[in-house]
Amino acid sequence: MTTASTTSKDGYTFAGVLLLVLGAFNLIDGFMLLDRSELFADAYVFSNASTWGWILIVFGVCQFVAGAMLARGSGGRTMALTLAGIGMVLWFMLLFTFPFASLIGTAINFSVIASVLSTDPN
């Protein structure tokens, strides 16, 4: 039986593109929270909307950098796994504020982790 073989970088490219998308989501949400922080005054765990906006902006930039590194093939496996794991926790903490977006963000982070872990690092 013959199976189709893929290069070991396919999973990393897929995960890198997903991290780029997640970084863009986090940047958009972060800027939205900074712009409209008065609309979400008491809906956040541990802090206010402006603080969460800055957290999401910084985290989005980090995810964007990790996604670019992973998609280009220049490393970033550990960074991608770490950021995807932290991203799942962050999106879960925003579950009651953005339920649909949180579920999508958590699912994409899980896909990044599954893709990176299922790809042979050699």
Question: What label would you give each PLM region?
Answer:
Residues 2-122:
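Membrane-interface extramembranous regions
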